[in-house]
Amino acid sequence: MVRALSIVFFVFVSNSFFSQVIKGRVMDENRAPIYGVKVSCRHHNAFTDFNGDFHLKRCDEDSVVFTHIEYERLAVKSEAEINVRLKAKITELDETKIIQKKLNNFEIGYLPPVRGVQIATGTNAIIQTENQQGAKSTGNPRELFAKIPGLNIWESDGAGIQMGVGGRGLSPNRAANFNMRQNGYDISADALGYPESYYTPPLEALSSIEIIRGSASLQYGTQFGGLMNFVIKEPVKDSPFEFTTRNTVGSFGYFGGFNRISGRIKRLEYQFYHQLKQGDGYRSNSAFTQHQFFGQIGYYLNEKNRLRLEYTGMHYDARQAGGLTDVMFEQDPRQSVRNRNWFRVNWNILALHYDYDISSRSTFNVRAFGMQSARYSLGFLGKINQADIGLNRELIAGNFENAGAEARFLTRYTVRLRKKTVSDLRGAFLTGVRYYQGTTRSEQGLASNDSLADYQFLNPRNLEYSSYDFPSRNFSYFLENIWFKGERLTFNTGFRFEYIHSSSQGFYKRYAIHPLSADTLGVYQVTDTTSLGRIVPLFGAGIAFKTSKLTQLYGNFCLNYRAVNFNDIRVSNPNIVIDTLIRDEYGSTTEIGYRGLIKPYLYTDLAVFHLFYGDKIGLAPEPNGTNKIRTNIGDARNVGVEAFVEMDFLKAFNDSSRFSLSAFVNFSYIHAVYIRSKEANFIGKEVEYVSPVMLRSGLKFKTKRFSTQLQFSYNEGQFSDASNALEPSGDAVIGYIPSYYVMDFSLRYEFRKWFQAEAGINNLLDASYYTRRATAYPGPGILPSDGRSFYLTLQYKFKR
């Protein structure tokens, strides 16, 4: 009896308790749970958990209110169980999200003016790599950047191991003129003295690539090219475990494997991936193996605070086929006359993010990062027209250790104006500081005389050529402000203050050689120590006017600066001589453009620009000598036109069509010349590695499951040095680079949501061409691009 009464009492109390509680679930428009939604009823509050569930004490009010910083406020009638879906908040400050949603089919677009702790105005682009078609495993840059005007591409390898891209007449060498970042932090070797990027994230791991130029790029650095930020896919939000595997086979013995796991468990989210690339290469002596690893763990402390820890690791070994002379290239571009050259890179990056949503208007972010990496080039570095007779090889070792932290604060505000006839002034203010410190050690000496990948000095304590340490420190303060006046006018300003201190300490050796017998008469060690600090203030401003809801005119101006690189001032290279008075570069960029959706099926992005490049560093024949000299050639002026247009023909006739047939044209014309120089014969000469006309176009057909694309790429001929030499030098370091065109074909079919196949042919017509003449590694000489190649990719996805 007592037991029965206890059960009745328990049931009664339970029912009474649950009758006093409102429960339910909150989801977005795609039925994904939303974490951190505030649920309110008079004085009682609750927050949704990671499954979107909530329990709220019942009150006497008739309505329950749901609020979240990223979603529209919603009030519903109070009931015992409430399940709701919230709409994403779209304000006038970030209304370009509307455009981006409409641009999903175009795989390209531009960034909202305000997002997170970032302001993006002027020329900028976002490449939606998740939706992009092409050879993702090998990272074909022609397909990746097909819709970004004005980019010149170096093709040093056919596997996407290193990226060489430059915009608006800037050098493509390892993308050194871009501030290269991943998830907002640095990935280059040394941000100050050696900003070359040996590491490129796998395209299969990316959600997008952000490119910001103009005044808004000052928040990231001083580079002429602006920012290029690789955005890794976020961990999946709606599953504790997801597994994706992509396996690719291709021509020249290529195999690529990409495996990723991801998930979220309550407040914890995670992802880990590994990528393998290996192959024999298009040319003889060009086999390679690369491993990449990435791990990310994120934890929500509460609905406003989030921590993320990331590790990136990469290792690759590549045999270097070396360069070719012009005669060799015409005979057989696949041949190699170097079989003892090797290249190795180890890359390790650790990063920590902290995000704090202070309020619906203000956000704070701190990102700290550190890197410990190394690169080794081993081989015979003599001129390519000299035979390798098997003597001791040269080894250049670079070790990079750096660390930094960047803090950003962004707040949105409204200025109430007294005059009723004048609309309020709305805006967003971003400010931040950055500290960076790094040390690069560069050593050059003799190594073994065999053909193995043996990265060891013969005399590590008495190097035959040079040994240097390059410490550097950098403090930066930056601010950006954007005003929205009325419904159409936007004005922004940016300022960056840089303090840079760089130094060098070490030695190099000079050899006295007998002019007839070539015997060594003496060796002289020269100790070299320098220290230089400088303050660099930079300014930028921009304006935009909305010609319609989905189109705008914009203009921008900003100052730029580039510090002398370590490799600019000290490397023993038999092919070039370094000017001892070489100095930093400076300049400015001005642009005017028009972009947007003219119609739902027609997107365009047009721009004209003027880039002034003062004290430009380049390669020229040495006066009264036979060598090439790296020096400040003079002042250059780059002016150009960039145009991109894409149209979906089927959508033009039927907006609700299930099929898509689109074509795009990407055209740029760049006129880059030296306008001042200490060498009179350089004035009026074209700037090296600037292709005056670049054209990329493509045709794509797409259904729900199937898509296919044909793409055409053309580059007009360009010079490789400031003297504009047409006839090649005997070592092929200097000479004209002829025009070339390439076609790429790809297709994709999705059998199910969990399985898809991709295939394609790169360089469909088997064109024989090259994009650069290398002065040293991986040459020297002509570096042929890959011929026709095939690939097949199978993707499988499992989701728990």
PLM regions: where:
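Short acidic/polar hinge/loop motifs at secondary-structure boundaries
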Residues: 185-213
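Short strand-turn segments of transmembrane beta-barrel domains in outer membranes
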Residues: 208, 215-217, 227-263, 274, ...
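Transmembrane beta-barrel wall of Gram-negative outer-membrane proteins
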Residues: 249-278, 283-319, 342-360, 479, ...
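Conserved C-terminal beta-signal and adjacent last beta-strands/turns
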Residues: 300, 312, 398, 555, ...
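Structural signature of Gram-negative outer-membrane beta-barrels, strongest in the C-terminal barrel
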Residues: 302, 421-428, 434-436, 468-612, ...
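Face-selective signature of the C-terminal outer-membrane beta-barrel domain
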Residues: 303-314, 345-512, 546, 605-608, ...
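Membrane-embedded beta-barrel scaffold of Gram-negative outer-membrane proteins
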Residues: 353-357, 363-379, 546, 552-558, ...
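Gram-negative outer-membrane beta-barrel transporters
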Residues: 410-416, 487, 499, 605-613, ...
